[in-house]
Amino acid sequence: MKKLVLIGIGMLFTLTVAAQNGLKTGMMAPQFTAKDNTGKSIELKQLLKSHKAVVLFFYRGQWCPYCNLHIKQLQDSLQQLTAKGAYVIGVTPETGENINKTIEKTHASFSMIQDKGYKIMDAYDVKFVMNDDLVNKYKGYGIDLDKNNGNSDHALPVPATYIIDHTGKITFVHFDKDYKKRASVATLLKQL
């Protein structure tokens, strides 16, 4: 029964995000400036001057086991990623308090950005708004997006990953509306 419910949630999630397409390989990455979880100013343009590439990924929240697994895998391979000249950034709509919960669960030591106004999510075309049925299903599982994100917008990102080279061009995209599928570290290392 639980498996059927999860399949139903997955189907609703897929229908909800049908309009999102994400950005494509070869496009110029939208520039952004934001503060990370440590208060450090993160400016994409400046990072690309001092790093070979930026690995930019979007995640849903500390309540998502698939997000936590992906973040932990990135953290476990962070030395390999940085050895290839990459700077890793996670972007999420969740509050700073919940970013800290994500960090506690995953031991992430890379920059995590709260995209409070969805500017980055919108620029990368990964934002979607959950319909009321899906919001209520999540609430039934104890997931309160209003509390987690600090608003009642019910907006989440498609869990996408981009590699942006030093020229600002997107050289790799993983964009899958199935929230269970993420870019593997092996794939990222191969693409860097």
Q: Over which residues does each language-model region extend?
A:
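Bacterial Sec-dependent N-terminal signal peptides
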Residues: 1-22
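N-terminal "domain-start" segment that seeds a small globular fold
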Residues: 19-46
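Short loop/turn microsegments at loop-to-beta-strand junctions
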Residues: 29-30, 53-54, 158-160
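Short active-site neighborhood of thiol/selenol oxidoreductases, capturing the structured segment around
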Residues: 45-68, 72-74
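Solvent-exposed, acidic/flexible segments
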Residues: 60, 67, 92, 157, ...
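Structural microenvironment flanking redox-active thiols in thiol-disulfide oxidoreductases
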Residues: 69-125
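Thiol/selenol-based redox catalytic cores and closely related redox-interacting motifs
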Residues: 115-180
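A short, polar/charged loop-to-alpha-helix boundary motif
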Residues: 179-191
